[in-house]
Amino acid sequence: MGIYSFWIFDRHCNCIFDREWTLASNSASGTINSKQNEEDAKLLYGMIFSLRSITQKLSKGSVKNDIRSISTGKYRVHTYCTASGLWFVLLSDFKQQSYTQVLQYIYSHIYVKYVSNNLLSPYDFAENENEMRGQGTRKITNRNFISVLESFLAPMVNQ
């Protein structure tokens, strides 16, 4: 299996979209925006945030030191951070080298078209002060975004 899950975090640490695939043989299996994934989202964002903070402290001067992927024995986490503070995260098997360009494409061609340019979609997913720091409950539910994202990622799920 190539891709296990896909996550989008906003600038307030909230998981605003998550998709998890459970069966390699069926790219339609799994969950979208599931309540069960909330704890996993917090752990994943916490790990990325902590490693990013460490790399910024270790980098000298004005040299930009971004995290693009994190590897473990069985998994690889691919990340892409936008200028507006959105984090696009893809969890894949260890064999996949880089999904940075895939994440950039998802942001620039799918997210911008179906979420950012949609006047009915919220600009900021944290409605008030209480929904910051990972406490937000609003998710991306745009059917067009979900279907285009599904069709784009489906071939990579079964790699």
UniProtKB/Swiss-Prot annotation:
Location(s) in or outside the cell: Golgi apparatus, cis-Golgi network; Endoplasmic reticulum; Preautophagosomal structure
Pfam families in alphabetical order: Sybindin
Any single GO BP term: intra-Golgi vesicle-mediated transport
Keyword Chaperone: no
UniProt record similarity statement: Belongs to the TRAPP small subunits family. BET5 subfamily.
Subunit structure: Part of the multisubunit TRAPP (transport protein particle) I complex composed of BET3, BET5, TRS20, TRS23, TRS31 and TRS33. Part of the multisubunit TRAPP (transport protein particle) II complex composed of BET3, BET5, TRS20, TRS23, TRS31, TRS33, TRS65, TRS85, TRS120 and TRS130. Part of the multisubunit TRAPP (transport protein particle) III complex composed of BET3, BET5, TRS20, TRS23, TRS31, TRS33 and TRS85.
Protein name (database record): Trafficking protein particle complex subunit BET5
